[in-house]
Amino acid sequence: DILAAFRVTPQPGVPPEEAGAAVAXESSTGTWTTVWTDGLTSLDRYKGRCYHIEPVPGEADQYICYVAYPLDLFEEGSVTNMFTSIVGNVFGFKALRALRLEDLRXPTAYIKTFQGPPHGIQVERDKLNKYGRPLLGCTIKPKLGLSAKNYGRAVFECLRGGLDFTKDDENVNSQPFMRWRDRFLFCAEALYKSQAETGEIKGHYLNATAGTCEEMIKRAVFARELGAPIVMHDYLTGGFTANTSLAHYCRDNGLLLHIHRAMHAVIDRQKNHGIHFRVLAKALRMSGGDHIHSGTVVGKLEGERDITLGFVDLLRDDFIEKDRSRGIYFTQDWVSLPGVLPVASGGIHVWHMPALTEIFGDDSVLQFGGGTLGHPWGNAPGAVANRVALEACVQARNEGRDLASEGNEIIREASKWSPELAAACEVWKEIKFEFQAMDTLDPSSDK
């Protein structure tokens, strides 16, 4: 069975058992009345069952309802169909004040019907020939308004300075100021030039997201013809069907696939309604993507440490044990489906490097947009500062130093022999984003 954990807030006067049963029925075989055609099938075989209900500690009138769905209710290899059933009409149900899908366990038999990420972590490292450290990226800013040639120039400067990747912003598709074909050509030129100068393999996430699936694949084909190693997709705005199609194309044609999660906060930010990001992350691993943005814990965007690490491990590891202290409601076996690299991006700079290296470990991509392009000396020195900071943190960690307590000292030491890093340290020493996360763990959910 596919198991789901829902956070249910019933309307006043509706008992939790009734609310849980209503969720199970409406998201499987039920409708609002008894119909004659019920007698033509075996409802016992196909109906969802609410098998356990527990109150949420510290929250009045909130319950976690566990529902089991028979596997035959779902089309093989279709995240779209899975979500249409589990989070379809039921979210508009009048008997509920609010409803949130907290976690999902897909059985191994169902996981095996998905291709998953086009390549996965190990194959990506082999393609790029980069081992033993996180990968470094940069989102080109300003995100909108640059001409293709100026955009390509910024890409070259960042890659030349020592970054592994640069990135199209999620809103960059094919606008009047920069059509996609021109951008792809100038970025490919920047790639080849920076590779020749540094001797390292470089990549730029060429955003293939488009208004139709056909146009999206056309852009991916052009990227492949240019010899680009990686393309990009906005998987929530583009949709799971489009994403799975692109992931299949990428595997067949040797392209890596970077996934941006634009629109996720609309779905996952409220604690009592929507879908938790850990479910969207699992769905992405099934649908296909080699990288996905996962929050930073320390930057400008939402994300509590334990919750973030919970779904970061869900993306990378082959087997995850149930651990309510990190918000993981079910044990999940990925049966060798390739892993996805989490991408930390959003409001981070060189002073965050020790924390990011410690939190995310080697199998991650650390992306500094403003933290590269905001360097007072320019784009290339900004890239140099980030690369030096990363190498210093990795070396310190390998020597057994504690990045959590000695992080600032490690960065200060490194800045003595890197003027670029020293300048970056001076600019960003005061910037902090200290707000309480909206989506937090429940008080005693460490069962």
Curated annotation (Swiss-Prot):
Processing and modification events after translation: The disulfide bond which can form in the large chain dimeric partners within the hexadecamer appears to be associated with oxidative stress and protein turnover.
Uppermost EC category: lyase
Gene3D superfamilies cross-referenced by the UniProt entry: Ribulose bisphosphate carboxylase, large subunit, C-terminal domain, RuBisCO large subunit, N-terminal domain
Entry function: RuBisCO catalyzes two reactions: the carboxylation of D-ribulose 1,5-bisphosphate, the primary event in carbon dioxide fixation, as well as the oxidative fragmentation of the pentose substrate in the photorespiration process. Both reactions occur simultaneously and in competition at the same active site.
Active site positions: K141 (proton acceptor), H260 (proton acceptor)
Pfam families, per the entry: RuBisCO_large (PF00016), RuBisCO_large_N (PF02788)
Location of the protein in the cell: Plastid, Chloroplast
NCBIfam families: PRK04208.1 (NF003252)
Protein encoded by which gene: rbcL
Gene Ontology cellular component annotations, sorted alphabetically: chloroplast
Cofactor binding comment, as recorded: Binds 1 Mg(2+) ion per subunit.
Reaction it catalyzes: 2 (2R)-3-phosphoglycerate + 2 H(+) = D-ribulose 1,5-bisphosphate + CO2 + H2O; D-ribulose 1,5-bisphosphate + O2 = 2-phosphoglycolate + (2R)-3-phosphoglycerate + 2 H(+)
Entry binding sites for Mg(2+): K167, D169, E170
HAMAP family documented for this protein: RuBisCO_L_type1
Domain of life: Eukaryota
Name of the protein: Ribulose bisphosphate carboxylase large chain
Family: Belongs to the RuBisCO large chain family. Type I subfamily.
Complex formation: Heterohexadecamer of 8 large chains and 8 small chains; disulfide-linked. The disulfide link is formed within the large subunit homodimers.
Disulfide bond is among the record's keywords: yes
Entry cofactors: Mg(2+)
